[in-house]
Amino acid sequence: MRCLVALILTVLIVTPEVEAKTLPDKFLGTFKLERDENFDEYLKARGYGWIMRQVIKLAGVTKKFRNAASGKPDRYDMENLTTKKDTHHKDWALGEEFQDEALDSTQHKITFDLKDPNTLTETHIKVDDPTDVETYEYRRDGDYLVMKMSWKGVSTSRYYKKQ
């Protein structure tokens, strides 16, 4: 019996408390793409040909971040709504990896997390090519959600206005 009590006390003392992360309210809402900087050069660096770059650039994009429809605390839903394809990432938690279909119609391992209180990250690892890792950084700037991406030294910023 003493061993059991000692074991329980050890687990309680040694095990760090795991606290769920909460997405700051400033990231919640609906944001519609209004403009971008250097996006064509970024798409070239990613290997997209001219026709596909035009299709991607002409696609309207709306991003929605909200508390999860499941009602579970510290869980979220995110939607990418485009004129080409929509994706819905449901019931995820910050720092938790999940697998889902991305805008390129392939399966990705996706993790949303907070780099700091002002920066939300979204990391994608292609399931069929784990060397293809891409991280998007989101920050709020006034009425805008600014998404920054880089690939092989080429960076872009996309500005989504809060609706």
Curated annotation (Swiss-Prot):
Residues spanning the signal sequence: 1-23
Molecular functions (GO terms): lipid binding
Superkingdom of origin: Eukaryota
Transmembrane residue ranges: none
Tissue expression as described in the entry: Abundant in the fluid surrounding the developing embryo of Ascaris suum.
Record key words, sorted: Lipid-binding, Signal, Transport
Gene3D superfamilies: 2.40.128.20
Family: Belongs to the calycin superfamily. Fatty-acid binding protein (FABP) family.
Purpose of the protein: May play a role in sequestering potentially toxic fatty acids and their peroxidation products, or it may be involved in the maintenance of the impermeable lipid layer of the eggshell.
PANTHER family from the UniProt entry: FATTY ACID-BINDING PROTEIN HOMOLOG 1-RELATED, FATTY ACID-BINDING PROTEIN HOMOLOG 1-RELATED-RELATED
Domain writeup: Forms a beta-barrel structure that accommodates hydrophobic ligands in its interior.
Name of the protein described by the UniProt record: Fatty acid-binding protein homolog
Species whose genome carries this gene: Ascaris suum
